[in-house]
Amino acid sequence: MTPKIAIIGEGVIGCSTALQVAQAVPDARVTVLSDRPFEQTCSFGPAGLFRIDDIANREFGKSTFDWFAHLHRTEKGDKTGVKLLSGHIQSDSKERLEQQQKAYGDIVYNFRFLEKREILDLFPNPSEHCIHYTAFASEGNKYVPYLKFQCQARGVEFLHRKVRDLEELANEGYDVIVNCAGLSGGTLAGDDDSVYPIRGVVLDVEAHWHKHFNYKDFITFTIPKENSVVIGSVKQENRWDLEITDVDRKDILERYVALHPAMREPKILGEWSGLRPARKTIRIEKVEKKSEKSGKKYTVVHHYGHGGNGFTLGWGTAVEATKLVKSALNSSKL
Protein backbone atom coordinates (compact mmCIF):
# COMPACT_ATOMS: atom_id res chain seq x y z
CA MET A 1 0.00 0.00 0.00
CA THR A 2 1.42 3.38 -1.05
CA PRO A 3 1.73 5.78 1.90
CA LYS A 4 0.27 9.26 1.49
CA ILE A 5 2.17 12.11 3.10
CA ALA A 6 1.01 15.72 3.29
CA ILE A 7 3.38 18.58 4.06
CA ILE A 8 1.83 21.91 4.97
CA GLY A 9 3.96 24.89 3.96
CA GLU A 10 5.91 25.79 0.82
CA GLY A 11 8.67 27.83 2.45
CA VAL A 12 12.22 26.74 3.15
CA ILE A 13 11.12 24.39 5.96
CA GLY A 14 8.34 22.72 3.97
CA CYS A 15 10.44 22.28 0.82
CA SER A 16 13.49 21.01 2.74
CA THR A 17 11.27 18.44 4.44
CA ALA A 18 9.47 17.45 1.25
CA LEU A 19 12.74 16.80 -0.58
CA GLN A 20 14.18 14.69 2.22
CA VAL A 21 10.95 12.71 2.64
CA ALA A 22 10.80 12.07 -1.11
CA GLN A 23 14.39 10.82 -1.02
CA ALA A 24 13.90 8.70 2.10
CA VAL A 25 10.52 7.20 1.12
CA PRO A 26 10.62 7.07 -2.69
CA ASP A 27 7.44 4.99 -3.00
CA ALA A 28 5.32 7.50 -1.05
CA ARG A 29 2.87 9.99 -2.54
CA VAL A 30 4.06 13.32 -1.18
CA THR A 31 1.92 16.45 -1.49
CA VAL A 32 2.91 19.96 -0.39
CA LEU A 33 0.00 22.27 0.46
CA SER A 34 0.29 26.05 0.73
CA ASP A 35 -2.35 28.74 1.12
CA ARG A 36 -0.37 31.45 -0.67
CA PRO A 37 2.14 31.92 -3.51
CA PHE A 38 5.78 31.43 -2.55
CA GLU A 39 6.45 35.14 -3.22
CA GLN A 40 4.19 35.97 -0.27
CA THR A 41 5.93 33.66 2.19
CA CYS A 42 8.58 34.57 4.75
CA SER A 43 11.12 32.53 2.76
CA PHE A 44 11.09 34.71 -0.36
CA GLY A 45 13.07 37.75 0.77
CA PRO A 46 15.99 36.66 2.98
CA ALA A 47 19.58 36.70 1.77
CA GLY A 48 20.13 33.72 4.07
CA LEU A 49 23.55 34.29 5.62
CA PHE A 50 24.58 31.33 7.78
CA ARG A 51 24.59 32.38 11.43
CA ILE A 52 23.31 30.43 14.44
CA ASP A 53 21.49 32.43 17.11
CA ASP A 54 21.14 29.68 19.74
CA ILE A 55 23.98 27.30 20.59
CA ALA A 56 21.37 24.61 21.32
CA ASN A 57 20.80 24.44 17.54
CA ARG A 58 24.46 23.81 16.65
CA GLU A 59 23.96 20.33 15.22
CA PHE A 60 21.06 21.44 13.04
CA GLY A 61 23.26 24.23 11.72
CA LYS A 62 26.19 21.89 11.09
CA SER A 63 23.97 19.56 9.07
CA THR A 64 22.70 22.47 6.99
CA PHE A 65 26.22 23.82 6.47
CA ASP A 66 27.37 20.44 5.18
CA TRP A 67 24.41 20.40 2.76
CA PHE A 68 25.32 23.87 1.48
CA ALA A 69 28.93 22.75 1.01
CA HIS A 70 27.66 19.83 -1.08
CA LEU A 71 25.59 22.17 -3.24
CA HIS A 72 28.54 24.54 -3.59
CA ARG A 73 30.73 21.69 -4.85
CA THR A 74 28.22 20.12 -7.21
CA GLU A 75 25.76 22.76 -8.49
CA LYS A 76 25.93 26.21 -10.04
CA GLY A 77 25.27 28.97 -7.55
CA ASP A 78 23.02 30.93 -9.89
CA LYS A 79 20.72 27.90 -9.88
CA THR A 80 20.78 27.04 -6.16
CA GLY A 81 21.17 30.54 -4.73
CA VAL A 82 23.97 29.20 -2.51
CA LYS A 83 27.33 30.98 -2.49
CA LEU A 84 30.31 31.63 -0.24
CA LEU A 85 30.56 35.02 1.46
CA SER A 86 33.10 36.52 3.82
CA GLY A 87 32.46 39.41 6.15
CA HIS A 88 32.31 40.85 9.62
CA ILE A 89 30.10 41.22 12.67
CA GLN A 90 30.87 44.18 14.92
CA SER A 91 29.77 44.70 18.52
CA ASP A 92 30.77 46.65 21.59
CA SER A 93 30.06 43.48 23.56
CA LYS A 94 32.85 40.92 23.30
CA GLU A 95 30.64 38.46 25.18
CA ARG A 96 28.03 38.51 22.39
CA LEU A 97 30.70 37.73 19.81
CA GLU A 98 32.15 34.97 21.98
CA GLN A 99 28.67 33.43 22.03
CA GLN A 100 28.75 33.46 18.23
CA GLN A 101 32.13 31.74 18.34
CA LYS A 102 30.77 28.97 20.57
CA ALA A 103 27.69 28.52 18.41
CA TYR A 104 29.37 28.15 15.02
CA GLY A 105 33.01 29.25 15.07
CA ASP A 106 34.24 25.71 14.29
CA ILE A 107 31.52 25.10 11.66
CA VAL A 108 32.19 28.05 9.34
CA TYR A 109 35.52 28.83 7.68
CA ASN A 110 38.24 31.26 8.81
CA PHE A 111 36.54 32.39 12.03
CA ARG A 112 38.65 34.83 14.05
CA PHE A 113 38.56 38.02 16.09
CA LEU A 114 40.05 41.05 14.37
CA GLU A 115 42.92 42.96 15.90
CA LYS A 116 42.40 46.59 16.88
CA ARG A 117 44.46 47.82 13.93
CA GLU A 118 42.29 45.90 11.49
CA ILE A 119 39.07 47.25 13.00
CA LEU A 120 40.34 50.84 12.74
CA ASP A 121 41.51 50.31 9.15
CA LEU A 122 38.28 48.72 7.94
CA PHE A 123 35.49 50.68 9.59
CA PRO A 124 34.91 54.46 9.72
CA ASN A 125 32.75 54.19 12.85
CA PRO A 126 34.09 51.02 14.45
CA SER A 127 32.79 49.01 17.35
CA GLU A 128 35.08 47.79 20.10
CA HIS A 129 35.17 44.21 18.82
CA CYS A 130 34.71 42.41 15.52
CA ILE A 131 34.70 38.87 14.17
CA HIS A 132 35.42 37.70 10.64
CA TYR A 133 34.30 34.47 9.01
CA THR A 134 33.43 32.85 5.69
CA ALA A 135 30.19 30.93 5.26
CA PHE A 136 27.40 30.16 2.85
CA ALA A 137 24.47 32.40 2.06
CA SER A 138 21.31 31.03 0.46
CA GLU A 139 19.10 33.51 -1.38
CA GLY A 140 15.51 32.64 -0.57
CA ASN A 141 14.10 33.53 -3.97
CA LYS A 142 16.48 31.07 -5.62
CA TYR A 143 17.23 28.42 -3.02
CA VAL A 144 13.62 27.51 -2.22
CA PRO A 145 12.60 27.26 -5.92
CA TYR A 146 15.64 24.99 -6.40
CA LEU A 147 14.39 22.73 -3.59
CA LYS A 148 10.90 22.76 -5.13
CA PHE A 149 12.29 21.78 -8.54
CA GLN A 150 14.17 18.88 -6.95
CA CYS A 151 10.97 17.81 -5.20
CA GLN A 152 8.95 17.90 -8.41
CA ALA A 153 11.60 15.86 -10.19
CA ARG A 154 10.91 13.17 -7.58
CA GLY A 155 7.15 13.27 -8.09
CA VAL A 156 6.16 15.60 -5.25
CA GLU A 157 2.91 17.44 -6.00
CA PHE A 158 2.37 21.08 -5.00
CA LEU A 159 -1.15 22.38 -4.37
CA HIS A 160 -2.44 25.83 -3.39
CA ARG A 161 -4.97 25.20 -0.67
CA LYS A 162 -5.71 26.49 2.81
CA VAL A 163 -5.77 23.75 5.45
CA ARG A 164 -7.94 24.72 8.40
CA ASP A 165 -7.76 21.45 10.33
CA LEU A 166 -5.24 18.61 10.18
CA GLU A 167 -8.02 16.06 10.54
CA GLU A 168 -9.48 17.03 7.17
CA LEU A 169 -6.32 15.70 5.54
CA ALA A 170 -6.51 12.48 7.53
CA ASN A 171 -10.08 12.00 6.30
CA GLU A 172 -8.77 12.35 2.74
CA GLY A 173 -6.49 9.38 3.29
CA TYR A 174 -3.20 10.96 4.33
CA ASP A 175 -1.25 8.71 6.69
CA VAL A 176 1.34 11.26 7.85
CA ILE A 177 0.86 15.03 7.98
CA VAL A 178 3.92 17.24 8.47
CA ASN A 179 3.11 20.63 9.94
CA CYS A 180 5.62 23.10 8.46
CA ALA A 181 3.16 25.98 8.58
CA GLY A 182 5.51 28.47 10.21
CA LEU A 183 3.59 31.25 11.90
CA SER A 184 0.36 29.22 11.60
CA GLY A 185 2.02 26.07 12.92
CA GLY A 186 0.81 26.43 16.49
CA THR A 187 -2.76 27.23 15.45
CA LEU A 188 -2.89 24.20 13.16
CA ALA A 189 -1.42 22.02 15.89
CA GLY A 190 -4.25 23.10 18.15
CA ASP A 191 -2.18 22.74 21.32
CA ASP A 192 0.43 25.49 20.99
CA ASP A 193 -0.09 29.23 21.49
CA SER A 194 3.62 30.02 21.86
CA VAL A 195 4.34 31.00 18.24
CA TYR A 196 4.62 34.73 17.59
CA PRO A 197 5.76 36.99 14.73
CA ILE A 198 8.96 38.99 14.56
CA ARG A 199 8.49 41.57 11.83
CA GLY A 200 11.42 42.10 9.48
CA VAL A 201 12.08 44.60 6.69
CA VAL A 202 14.95 44.67 4.18
CA LEU A 203 15.84 46.91 1.26
CA ASP A 204 17.51 45.70 -1.94
CA VAL A 205 19.98 48.33 -3.16
CA GLU A 206 22.38 48.73 -6.04
CA ALA A 207 25.94 48.42 -4.73
CA HIS A 208 27.84 46.02 -6.99
CA TRP A 209 31.13 47.10 -5.41
CA HIS A 210 30.09 45.84 -1.97
CA LYS A 211 31.24 42.22 -1.69
CA HIS A 212 31.29 41.36 2.04
CA PHE A 213 28.57 41.06 4.65
CA ASN A 214 28.76 43.62 7.43
CA TYR A 215 26.80 43.42 10.70
CA LYS A 216 26.44 45.63 13.75
CA ASP A 217 24.88 43.65 16.61
CA PHE A 218 22.69 41.44 14.37
CA ILE A 219 19.95 43.97 13.46
CA THR A 220 21.86 46.43 11.26
CA PHE A 221 23.52 44.68 8.32
CA THR A 222 24.29 44.30 4.64
CA ILE A 223 24.46 40.98 2.79
CA PRO A 224 25.48 40.87 -0.89
CA LYS A 225 23.17 38.93 -3.21
CA GLU A 226 23.78 37.98 -6.84
CA ASN A 227 22.46 41.22 -8.34
CA SER A 228 21.99 43.52 -5.36
CA VAL A 229 22.84 44.10 -1.72
CA VAL A 230 20.35 43.63 1.10
CA ILE A 231 20.26 46.28 3.83
CA GLY A 232 18.36 45.49 7.00
CA SER A 233 16.58 45.27 9.23
CA VAL A 234 14.07 45.55 12.03
CA LYS A 235 13.14 42.91 14.60
CA GLN A 236 9.76 43.84 16.00
CA GLU A 237 8.11 41.18 18.13
CA ASN A 238 4.34 40.65 17.95
CA ARG A 239 3.84 43.06 15.06
CA TRP A 240 1.66 41.61 12.31
CA ASP A 241 1.64 44.47 9.78
CA LEU A 242 3.61 43.99 6.56
CA GLU A 243 3.33 47.46 5.03
CA ILE A 244 6.75 49.08 4.70
CA THR A 245 6.65 52.68 5.91
CA ASP A 246 8.87 55.72 5.43
CA VAL A 247 9.78 55.32 9.10
CA ASP A 248 11.11 51.81 8.34
CA ARG A 249 13.15 53.00 5.35
CA LYS A 250 14.61 56.00 7.17
CA ASP A 251 15.48 54.00 10.27
CA ILE A 252 17.21 51.18 8.37
CA LEU A 253 19.19 53.47 6.06
CA GLU A 254 20.26 55.89 8.79
CA ARG A 255 21.50 53.07 11.02
CA TYR A 256 23.50 51.42 8.27
CA VAL A 257 24.92 54.61 6.76
CA ALA A 258 26.17 55.59 10.23
CA LEU A 259 28.04 52.28 10.21
CA HIS A 260 29.21 52.52 6.59
CA PRO A 261 28.93 56.06 5.10
CA ALA A 262 29.88 54.88 1.60
CA MET A 263 26.38 53.40 1.35
CA ARG A 264 24.66 56.79 1.63
CA GLU A 265 21.86 57.60 -0.84
CA PRO A 266 21.75 54.13 -2.42
CA LYS A 267 19.55 53.33 -5.39
CA ILE A 268 16.75 51.19 -3.96
CA LEU A 269 15.86 48.34 -6.32
CA GLY A 270 13.20 46.72 -4.16
CA GLU A 271 12.00 46.11 -0.64
CA TRP A 272 10.50 43.23 1.30
CA SER A 273 8.86 42.59 4.63
CA GLY A 274 8.08 39.33 6.37
CA LEU A 275 7.01 37.84 9.67
CA ARG A 276 9.57 35.48 11.17
CA PRO A 277 7.79 32.54 12.88
CA ALA A 278 9.34 32.67 16.34
CA ARG A 279 9.08 30.26 19.25
CA LYS A 280 11.24 29.69 22.34
CA THR A 281 12.40 26.39 20.82
CA ILE A 282 11.86 24.76 17.45
CA ARG A 283 9.12 22.16 17.63
CA ILE A 284 10.05 18.81 16.05
CA GLU A 285 7.63 16.28 17.45
CA LYS A 286 5.60 13.23 16.41
CA VAL A 287 2.01 12.97 17.64
CA GLU A 288 -0.31 10.01 17.03
CA LYS A 289 -3.90 10.96 16.23
CA LYS A 290 -7.28 9.41 15.47
CA SER A 291 -9.96 11.08 13.37
CA GLU A 292 -13.14 11.70 15.32
CA LYS A 293 -15.13 11.58 12.08
CA SER A 294 -13.76 8.48 10.35
CA GLY A 295 -11.82 6.72 13.10
CA LYS A 296 -8.71 6.70 10.89
CA LYS A 297 -5.40 6.64 12.74
CA TYR A 298 -2.76 9.03 11.45
CA THR A 299 0.46 10.71 12.53
CA VAL A 300 1.28 14.40 12.74
CA VAL A 301 4.91 15.51 12.66
CA HIS A 302 5.27 19.10 13.86
CA HIS A 303 8.18 21.02 12.35
CA TYR A 304 7.99 24.78 12.91
CA GLY A 305 9.20 27.70 15.02
CA HIS A 306 12.56 28.56 13.39
CA GLY A 307 12.29 32.33 13.82
CA GLY A 308 14.91 34.08 11.68
CA ASN A 309 17.10 30.96 11.38
CA GLY A 310 15.05 28.98 8.86
CA PHE A 311 17.74 28.96 6.18
CA THR A 312 20.57 28.23 8.62
CA LEU A 313 18.77 25.40 10.44
CA GLY A 314 16.09 24.18 8.02
CA TRP A 315 17.94 21.36 6.30
CA GLY A 316 19.21 20.02 9.61
CA THR A 317 15.83 20.10 11.33
CA ALA A 318 14.28 18.49 8.25
CA VAL A 319 16.66 15.55 8.76
CA GLU A 320 15.08 15.00 12.19
CA ALA A 321 11.53 15.53 10.93
CA THR A 322 12.12 12.99 8.16
CA LYS A 323 13.30 10.43 10.71
CA LEU A 324 9.97 10.89 12.51
CA VAL A 325 8.05 10.42 9.25
CA LYS A 326 9.92 7.17 8.55
CA SER A 327 9.34 6.02 12.12
CA ALA A 328 5.60 6.63 11.74
CA LEU A 329 5.45 4.67 8.50
CA ASN A 330 7.46 1.80 9.97
CA SER A 331 5.19 1.66 13.02
CA SER A 332 2.08 1.43 10.86
CA LYS A 333 3.87 -0.87 8.36
CA LEU A 334 2.78 1.21 5.38
Curated annotation (Swiss-Prot):
Its family?
Belongs to the DAMOX/DASOX family.
Subcellular location per UniProt equals: Peroxisome matrix
Task: Note whether Nucleotide-binding occurs among the keywords.
Answer: no
Q: After gene disruption, what is the outcome?
A: Mutant worms have decreased egg-laying capacity at 20 degrees Celsius and decreased hatching rate and smaller brood size at 25 degrees Celsius. Mutant worms have high D-Asp and D-Glu content at both egg and young adult stage but do not show any change in physical appearance. Mutant worms also exhibit decreased fertilization rates.
Amino-acid positions noted as binding FAD in the UniProt annotation, renumbered to this chain = 35-36, 43, 307, 312
This protein's gene is called ddo-1
| Protein name from the UniProt record | D-aspartate oxidase 1
What span is annotated as the signal peptide, if there is one?
A: none
Q: Which UniProt keywords apply?
A: FAD, Flavoprotein, Oxidoreductase, Peroxisome
Sorted alphabetically, the Gene Ontology cellular component annotations on this record are: cytoplasm; peroxisomal matrix
Provenance organism: Caenorhabditis elegans
Q: Please list the reactions this protein catalyses.
A: D-aspartate + O2 + H2O = oxaloacetate + H2O2 + NH4(+); D-glutamate + O2 + H2O = H2O2 + 2-oxoglutarate + NH4(+)
Gene Ontology molecular function:
D-amino-acid oxidase activity; D-aspartate oxidase activity; D-glutamate oxidase activity; FAD binding
Q: Mainly localized where? A: other
User: Which InterPro entries does this chain map to?
Assistant: D-amino_acid_oxidase_CS, DAO, FAD-dep_OxRdtase
Q: Does the keyword Oxidoreductase apply?
A: yes
